[in-house]
């Protein structure tokens, strides 16, 4: 059986993002065109569908790391802030973006909140595993793994 660990992350995330676009409960908010993904970024994302890509990446991250909280996900999506001539410092990613995307994934039934953080539901696990199986069929060279 194919799992998330058997396929490249970028191909899986793009496939899941396409499927999340069709989900009625995962929608990009109105403010999505005006925000950066963290204080360490200078510009907003160039991809117009970046909300679905981030939601797919969060779903994969909850699958791999769960139970996981918003704060640790902020650390994962953070980066170095350019402070001019001063040394760079690490800054965490946007919590509002992560929180809202996780809430939408909860409404879809793909993840659930527990005491220690958010974990993937059986529906979410099968959703990701099916997407991984489709990616594995499409990409040549992955069949032998």
From Swiss-Prot:
Alphabetical list of Pfam families matching this protein: Ribosomal_S19e
GO molecular function: RNA binding; structural constituent of ribosome
Keyword Phosphoprotein: no
Keyword RNA-binding tagged: no
One cellular component term from this protein's GO annotations in UniProt: cytosolic small ribosomal subunit
Subunit field text: Part of the 30S ribosomal subunit.
Family indicated by similarity: Belongs to the eukaryotic ribosomal protein eS19 family.
Cited function: May be involved in maturation of the 30S ribosomal subunit.
Protein name, UniProt field: Small ribosomal subunit protein eS19
Originating species: Methanothermobacter thermautotrophicus (strain ATCC 29096 / DSM 1053 / JCM 10044 / NBRC 100330 / Delta H) (Methanobacterium thermoautotrophicum)
UniProt lineage: Archaea, Methanobacteriati, Methanobacteriota, Methanomada group, Methanobacteria
Gene transcribed to yield this protein: rps19e
